[in-house]
Amino acid sequence: MDYQHIKVERGGEIAIVTFNRPDKANALNHRHIEEIEHAALGFRDDETARVVVFTGAGKHFNSGADLTSDDPQHPLLMVRRQRRRIGQRCIQAILDMDQITIAAWKGAAMGGGACIATAMDFRIGARDCFMSYPEILIGVNLMWQSLPLCVHLVGPARAKQLVIGGKHVPGPTLLAWGALDEMVEADAVVEKAMEWARHYAAQPPVAAQMIKRSVNAISGALDRSVMHMDFDQHHLAADTSDAAEAVSAYLEKRPPTFTGN
């Protein structure tokens, strides 16, 4: 695949994947998500890379769905369901990577961007970083099988603050909650992530990979069984009048009026 929206740099034991739509705050369209999934799957056959650092070009890690995207909407629900599985596949591809994954996180990690960040093994954040799940603000649920990742990371009550509240949670709070492993100045975040990468790249790779898989299996044993319907819930919510009102209000920069329909 020829990448349009990401860059993949392979240089020995540490690789870097950069979300590369800085003019859109690295927002996600369908092609962008496909590229991230493809890159993650591509590391299955990489016998050299032991750690992969994910970061964003420009000021932001990843700002989530590009609501201005002109991605075509297929008239058949069956096809729309298939297309929307790309987000789940992308997150699962990241979770299944043998390599240790580290997010070098500046600015926003919103929606799908927050899902990607929570799928990483470690998160190094800049002081200006923040997380939010704005799906609730456009009348839909969080999908991509990522709700369990948020709950595992910050606990049930704080997950509800994030996912139901829809507010921006700043870096210092994320650090206190355990969503960040370390916080540094923005101009040092990539180098700090690389410092972590060098440490984990120096560990015995077979043992590191087995331990990672075991920890993920233990912590996420029920995740797929309880979240297999999240994209169908999304379709149900997305077809409501409230969801249409939320998107219109966002694009028109006005407060929404929700009716429960």
Mark where each language-model region is.
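C-terminal long alpha-helix characteristic of the crotonase
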Residues: 22, 124-129, 180-228, 241, ...
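Conserved CoA-thioester-binding segment of acyl-CoA-metabolizing enzymes
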Residues: 1-57, 92
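Glycine- (often His-adjacent) and acidic-residue-rich active-site loop
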Residues: 56-93, 109, 139, 222
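Glycine-rich beta-to-alpha active-site loop
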Residues: 90-138, 142, 168
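Well-ordered beta-strand positions
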Residues: 122, 161, 165-167, 173, ...
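Hydrophobic, secondary-structure "cap" segments at the distal end of domains
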Residues: 147-157
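Terminal low-complexity tails and localization/encapsulation signals of metabolic enzymes
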Residues: 1-3, 248-261
